[in-house]
């Protein structure tokens, strides 16, 4: 075992992964050598999710499992960071005595100094404050040869959705400087990234905290100029802020892929108003995007079982999903998170009813997804080749431009010689519920 080795376990969303890479950079600066094996690490860093209670349970279970390495003596220091720490703070000190250091989202950028203080004899275990820091990305650890990467363009959230804790966990909306984002993007491409996925709690609010009207459009136009960057993907786009200018920019771009992730949450006006999203008109937004961006793939997320949702409301939502035919769909049963307005609302839908509604929508979406993918069979399309299949070296895997990393399906490459990290032409030969099979033809 390396005398000063460290391992990372990153839970939750892509935005958390960006924070994790920043903390890894700080560990490397302290002299740690990163290892993928937690059993060989002297220091284990866990970046947690605290958005939903189910995610909190997963985070706690993970920490307790990793604490076993402290008991066995292989791990000297267990560090827990992120949203769960920001949400529960001091309560975790007694709940998880095995943990040496806790950092909220407010202090992830200061991991290095916290470890140094601890090694110098400090007995402080928790650092947490109201999140107001904006990371410029300069210290983010970049992995050589990775074909796809995330770029976080803002911190926090300025929306006040009734069901959501993000403003409390992440603070107010704070845009990064465009110059810092572009510098990071250039570094990622220089390290081998062909695809950059733009993330934030709300990407379409970029620049609004500074009074900038078309900051996101300007950023996308600047990313367009980066040589060797092939694909730019926009995730977490708040529906109300998808402007005609953004749609036009995407439709005219050579690099921004025809893909939008728009979390609509529901389609019934009364439910949307109760959620704190009364300005959203889902049908109008979807129609504007589909008419303005040819061949666009849409991903959305929906919440079923929100307080006050009747059977008629759910039937309206089902009809909306069937009519709209989203390429990708995530469905969540309402979770009454303590501290949110929604947790105090009357007319609670029984959890078993909410779960059944979720199953109905997911089954409906399974058929929609398969029909969408079957329409691609026989077409020749570019594929980002990502590497060998996790279960066999006989298959390569990749993604189409209409498939986001981790969230959507994949391309199973059954024939042809491919180069991981390259975008190559393929012919789609078969479709499944969420994945397609394809044969590689040549480089695009």
UniProtKB/Swiss-Prot annotation:
Sites where the protein binds [4Fe-4S] cluster 1: 13, 49, 83
GO CC annotation: cytosol
EC number: 2.8.4.4
Cofactor mode of binding and number, as noted: Binds 2 [4Fe-4S] clusters. One cluster is coordinated with 3 cysteines and an exchangeable S-adenosyl-L-methionine.
Transmembrane segments: none
GO molecular function: 4 iron, 4 sulfur cluster binding; aspartic acid methylthiotransferase activity; metal ion binding; protein methylthiotransferase activity
Record Gene3D superfamilies: Methylthiotransferase, N-terminal domain (3.40.50.12160), Nucleic acid-binding proteins (2.40.50.140), tm_1862 like domain (3.80.30.20)
Residue stretches making up the Radical SAM core domain: 143-371
CDD domains linked: Radical_SAM
Protein name: Ribosomal protein uS12 methylthiotransferase RimO
Originating organism: Syntrophobacter fumaroxidans (strain DSM 10017 / MPOB)
């Amino acid at each position: 075992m390396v005398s000063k080795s460290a391992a990372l376990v990153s839970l939750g969303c892509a935005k958390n992964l960006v924070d994790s890479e920043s903390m890894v950079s700080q560990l490397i600066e302290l002299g740690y050598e990163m290892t993928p094996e937690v059993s060989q690490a002297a220091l284990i860093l866990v970046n947690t999710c605290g958005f939903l209670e189910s995610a909190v349970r997963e985070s706690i279970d993970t920490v307790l499992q990793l604490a076993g390495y402290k008991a066995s003596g292989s791990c000297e220091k267990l560090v827990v960071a992120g949203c769960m720490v920001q949400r529960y703070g001091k309560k975790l000190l007694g709940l998880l005595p095995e943990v040496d250091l806790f950092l909220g989202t407010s202090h992830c950028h200061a991991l290095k100094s916290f470890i140094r203080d601890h090694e110098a004899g400090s007995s402080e275990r928790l650092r947490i404050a109201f999140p107001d820091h904006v990371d410029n990305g300069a210290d983010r650890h970049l992995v050589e040869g990775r074909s796809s990467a995330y770029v976080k363009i803002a911190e926090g959230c300025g929306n006040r959705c009734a069901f959501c804790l993000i403003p409390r966990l992440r603070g107010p909306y704070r845009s990064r400087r465009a110059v810092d984002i572009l510098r990071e993007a250039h570094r990622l491409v220089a390290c081998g990234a062909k695809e950059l996925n733009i993330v934030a709690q709300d990407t379409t609010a970029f620049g609004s905290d500074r009074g900038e009207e078309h900051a996101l459009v300007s950023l996308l136009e600047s990313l367009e100029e980066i040589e060797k960057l092939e694909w730019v993907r926009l995730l977490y786009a708040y529906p109300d802020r998808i402007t005609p200018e953004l749609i036009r920019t995407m439709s005219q771009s050579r690099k921004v892929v025809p893909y939008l992730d728009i979390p609509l949450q529901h389609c019934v006006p009364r439910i949307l108003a109760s959620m704190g999203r009364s300005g959203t008109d889902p049908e109008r937004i979807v129609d504007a995007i589909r008419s303005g961006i040819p061949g666009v793939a849409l991903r959305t997320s929906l919440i079923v079982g929100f307080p006050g949702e009747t059977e008629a409301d759910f039937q309206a939502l089902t009809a909306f999903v069937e009519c709209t035919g989203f390429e990708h769909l995530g469905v969540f049963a309402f979770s009454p998170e303590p501290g949110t307005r929604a947790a105090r609302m009357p007319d609670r839908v029984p959890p078993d009813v909410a779960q059944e509604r979720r199953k109905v929508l997911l089954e409906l979406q399974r058929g929609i997804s398969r029909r969408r993918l079957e329409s691609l069979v026989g077409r020749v399309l570019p594929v980002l080749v990502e590497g060998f299949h996790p279960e066999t070296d006989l298959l390569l895997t990749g993604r189409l431009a209409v498939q986001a990393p981790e969230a959507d399906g994949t391309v199973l490459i059954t024939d042809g010689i491919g180069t991981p990290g390259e975008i190559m032409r393929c012919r789609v030969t078969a479709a499944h519920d969420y994945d397609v099979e394809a044969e590689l033809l040549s480089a695009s």
